[in-house]
Amino acid sequence: MRWSRFFAYTQKEAPKDAVVASHKYLVRGGYIKQVAAGIYDFAPLGKMVLDNIRDIIKKEMDASGAQEVMLTFVTPNELWEETGRAKKYGKELLRIKDRKDQSFVLAPTNEESVVDLVRGTIKSYKQLPVNLYQINLKFRDEARPRFGLLRGREFIMKDAYSFHATEEDLDREFNLMEETYKNIFTKLGLDFRAVWADSGAIGGSGSKEFMVLADTGEDDIVVCSECDYAANIEVATRKHEKRENPVKTEVIEEVHTPDMKSIEDVCNFIGVDPYFSIKAVVKKAIYDDGKSEIVVFFVRGTDTLEETKATNAVGALELVDASEEELEAVGLVPGFIGPFGLPSSVRYIIDDDLRMAEELVCGANKKDYHIKGAGLLDANLLGNLTVYRDIAAVKEGDKCPKCGAPLKITKGIEVGHIFKLGTVYSEPMNATFLDENGKAKPFIMGCYGIGVSRLISAAIEQNHDDKGIIWPKQIAPFVVDIIVGDVKKDEQLIFAEDLYDKLTSAGVKTILDDRAERFGPKIADFELVGFPVCVIVGKKLKDGKVEVRDRRTGEKFEVEKDMALEKVMEIINN
């Protein structure tokens, strides 16, 4: 491809709303153009990267035995009504009506559609298992689309769905998909981790996320410093280590703590380590039937509440902050809430780490008073509704639940997610098969997604510098950029065209920059757009030399012109 004929454009300034590198460079480099909030056109460069990613994914999915399909983007709303997700998904599900006033949705995911495809078609266990996948457009009406392709409203996704007769066979496919995903992300040239995760709105009994490590990631990942333990902070656990309070209290007593509502103030006043205190976090739980209630979550004073864990612990759709007026309306005393003497109507959850804990400081449920020397040895002291759950967020330095080594927290961008769905979708949609005894059973399902367009941005977040993108060669739109210093010099153009022919004949994606531009802007475009290698055919050609540059390392090599091809191949294959 000649740059002079290629629909490519670069710009010096990034959009004002671009705050991450991938968004800035994709727009400046002419890969994408915004059409509306969270919706982008892909220019040729962007489409080439997208196709490279798609090809790697397709090759590995086909090798796993999965079969490609194409499901509808516009889906009847009635399918979503069958599973109850039409209501549960909320405003992110974009609903439309046709001229006959029939309701449809723009699919953000396709569980309902694929179950509808399979039910009545696969009738016997003899036809199982089957794994169907597609690489297709999706739409999620994000309230705040941002970060370019990382959180758009319209996006391209690879979603696969497997159907099984037994849980054991689902486990086999889940493990196969995990290995397939590892192969995909390795071949894409990415540094990633597979981590245990929350199933979220998709549902199911178990899931793993695939995270590209990047400082700009929105997700916190907990990883062990010694073993292979890794989990999203939403589900991460830790080894509980009990410490004995050196400050002993002969009797449980109330302490007057006027206007002291924070853990720090109370513990400093009483003279106790915050580890031996109980923090109350009050939320209003919203349920999918529209009802709500005030819930108190108790964690150690040194811990913070992990909201996804807390949401799952009470089976809520979401948790929102409760106002002081709402707390007072149910008999709570803001700033002085503790597990002893709570109003009987108030629901509460205690973190597992506090189970059987002693010598604690907590709120007395009375204004300006805290309790000193409290213990949770006897749950009956708290009433019959006491529930312990893991609701605290893991912190840096906590002990690994697997080996006991210190845990670290890093940032990641979610690019893949695999789920064990079980019968969450097949049962409500009455999708069944006949087992070996002739009995109707619901399909046991798995679900496996990859954010294809999101991978473009994730790759850049991991591979860039202050000049532009540094593409892994596996997904670069062009691997080599041949820059002609002066296109008016016939000898430069002839040599560049000959090298171009040799590289393309060798299967190397190459672009020939034959624009009648100054040398400076050509080099700037090479660095911005991010091709892995460039060959500069300039003034030194008359001395029999050209320059080869490695975009990743920044190294410059002056080589004999007859060695240019060999040097380029050496860098590419390194």
From Swiss-Prot:
PROSITE patterns per UniProt: AA_TRNA_LIGASE_II
Xref: Pfam families: HGTP_anticodon, tRNA-synt_2b, tRNA_edit
Top-rank lineage group of the source organism: Bacteria
A GO CC term attached to the entry: cytosol
CDD domains: ProRS-INS (cd04334), ProRS_anticodon_short (cd00861), ProRS_core_prok (cd00779)
SUPFAM superfamilies membership: Class II aaRS ABD-related, Class II aaRS and biotin synthetases, YbaK/ProRS associated domain
UniProt EC number: 6.1.1.15
Entry annotated with the keyword Aminoacyl-tRNA synthetase: yes
UniProt keyword terms in alphabetical order: Aminoacyl-tRNA synthetase, ATP-binding, Cytoplasm, Ligase, Nucleotide-binding, Protein biosynthesis
The reaction(s) this protein catalyses: tRNA(Pro) + L-proline + ATP = L-prolyl-tRNA(Pro) + AMP + diphosphate
Main subcellular location: cytoplasm
An example molecular function term from Gene Ontology annotations: aminoacyl-tRNA deacylase activity
Localization in the cell: Cytoplasm
GO biological process: prolyl-tRNA aminoacylation
Domain-related comment: Consists of three domains: the N-terminal catalytic domain, the editing domain and the C-terminal anticodon-binding domain.
UniProt similarity note: Belongs to the class-II aminoacyl-tRNA synthetase family. ProS type 1 subfamily.
NCBIfam families: PRK09194.1, proS_fam_II
Function: Catalyzes the attachment of proline to tRNA(Pro) in a two-step reaction: proline is first activated by ATP to form Pro-AMP and then transferred to the acceptor end of tRNA(Pro). As ProRS can inadvertently accommodate and process non-cognate amino acids such as alanine and cysteine, to avoid such errors it has two additional distinct editing activities against alanine. One activity is designated as 'pretransfer' editing and involves the tRNA(Pro)-independent hydrolysis of activated Ala-AMP.
Subunit structure: Homodimer.
Name of the featured protein: Proline--tRNA ligase
Source organism: Nautilia profundicola (strain ATCC BAA-1463 / DSM 18972 / AmH)
